[in-house]
Amino acid sequence: MSKSLNNLQPWGAFFLRLVLGVAMIYNGYDKVIPHGGFHGNAFSALDHHSHYVASLGLPYWLGYVSALAEFIGGILILLGLLTRFAAFLIACNMLVAIAMVTRHHGYSGSEYALALFVIALMLLFYGAGACALDRKIGFA
C-alpha cells in the first residue's frame, strides 16, 4: 500500500498547490486591485494595505511586498512556476500574519494563517509536484 501511495505523492503536492494558490490569490486580490477597477489611483489598494501594515509597527513598504507576495505568489504557486521561491515568500508572509496581526486577538483565528504557512513549507521543502511548469523548465 505504501508503494502505491508513494506513486501519488506528486499529486498531493499538486492539490496543496491548488489550495494555497487559490487562497493567496483570493486574499491578495483586494490588496492589489482597487475596488471598482483602476479608475484614478492604480495604487490605492496597495496604499491602503501598506497603511494597515504600518499601523502594526512594520515598515510601510512591507505592505507592498506583502500584498504582491500574496497575489503574484498565489499565481506562481497555482501555475507551479518558481514554486519554492513563491512558497518561501508566502511562508514568510504567513509567519508575519501569525505574529503581528493575530496577536491582537490572543492568537484566536490564527489557524487559517498557520495552515497556509504549513502548506507553503511543504511546497518549499518538497517542490511543486505534478502538473507544474517547474517540471517543464527544469526547476523541479
What are the roles of these predicted feature ranges?
Residues 41-44:
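Extracytoplasmic catalytic/substrate-binding loops of multi-pass membrane glycan-assembly enzymes
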